[in-house]
């Protein structure tokens, strides 16, 4: 078998990739202690994930944390993940389950809401009551991803190259004239 000097060892990234661009990801080198060994080191995998909570649904699609709270979209349910290694399904409603990632945004303490984008639909979760709305009608089929800026929710529609803007600190109010669209390719 051909010898590859320096093939097994850790990262040695330099500022310039021309100098050295070795990078080891999720593995660590363990030097061989014996001087008689033909190998200088061995690569071993880094310790992986630890199970934090178990839920009935599969396909973790989004995870969002704010103000000592954590929410997750798993399959068609929205879960509130607790710091006691437990999770509970938000009391009512489901979201569209598709193979794509979901997205979650918050309008902070002023609005107390989470906007969840899942399967081209948008859903509003009122944090104080753990109430999940049905799909927001104005955004039905128009929500690829969600975001927030300065208290305004944003809904991105990749099919139409548009983004929609909610009312200030109110994810339930969407004016159909409040959108922007790219008009020409760069």
Please describe what each predicted stretch is:
Residues 127-151:
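Asp-box/WD-like beta-propeller blade repeats and closely related beta-sheet repeat scaffolds
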Residues 88-93, 133-137:
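Local beta-strand/beta-hairpin segments that build beta-sheet-rich folds
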Residues 58-62, 66-67, 96-106:
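General structural concept
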Residues 98-122:
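Elongated alpha-helical scaffolds
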Residues 1-87, 142-186:
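N-terminal beta-propeller domains
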Residues 93-99, 138-143:
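Short coil/turn segments at the loop-to-beta-strand junctions that recur within blades
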Residues 123-136, 163-165, 172-176:
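Short secondary-structure capping/junction motifs at helix and strand boundaries
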Residues 117-121, 127, 158:
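Beta-hairpin (beta-strand-turn-beta-strand) motif
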